[in-house]
UniProtKB/Swiss-Prot annotation:
The lineage of its organism: Eukaryota, Discoba, Heterolobosea, Tetramitia, Eutetramitia. InterPro entries: Haemerythrin, Haemerythrin_Fe_BS, Hemerythrin, Hemerythrin-like, Hemerythrin-like_sf, Hemerythrin_metal-bd. It comes from Naegleria gruberi. This is Hemerythrin-like protein. Belongs to the hemerythrin family. Signal peptide: none annotated. The keyword Iron applies. CDD domains: Hemerythrin. Fe cation 1 binds at H26, H56, E60, D112. The keyword Iron applies. Fe cation 2 binds at E60, H75, H79, H107, D112.
């Protein structure tokens, strides 16, 4: 089920996962997506977003390992699938921005909320 994309597209307390480091990283993801949306032809904006996504996913997965998070395998699979899809982007238009925004919102409010109170 798709979660509504906030407008304006900004992090708010409904995205709080209970871990300050991850909340800050999520805030930066919102900012990087907005930067890409504002400059869709910028290869550097797309690269910066993808590089940060990879770093963020690794940070989450490292925390999962530390606490032996029960959903870590499934969660990592969703990360890997998104990275694979995102690395395949050649152009960034309305559909791609919508995909990225929807994925992030659904992922935080769905998968990431499963670790709230655990990490």
């Amino acid at each position: 089920m798709a979660t509504t994309i906030p407008s304006p597209f900004n992090w708010d307390s409904s995205f709080c996962v209970g871990n300050n480091e991850l909340n800050e990283q999520h805030k930066k993801l919102f900012a990087l997506i907005n930067a890409l949306d504002a400059n869709r032809s910028s290869a550097s904006a797309l690269k910066e977003l993808l590089d940060f996504v990879v770093m963020h996913f690794k940070a989450e997965e490292d925390l999962f390992a530390k606490v032996n998070f029960s959903d870590s395998t499934s969660h990592k699979e969703t990360h890997d699938k998104f990275v694979q899809d995102a690395l395949g982007l050649k152009t960034v238009g309305d559909a791609e921005i919508q995909f990225i925004k929807q994925w992030l919102v659904n992922h935080i409010k769905g998968s990431d909320m499963k670790y709230k109170g655990v990490l």
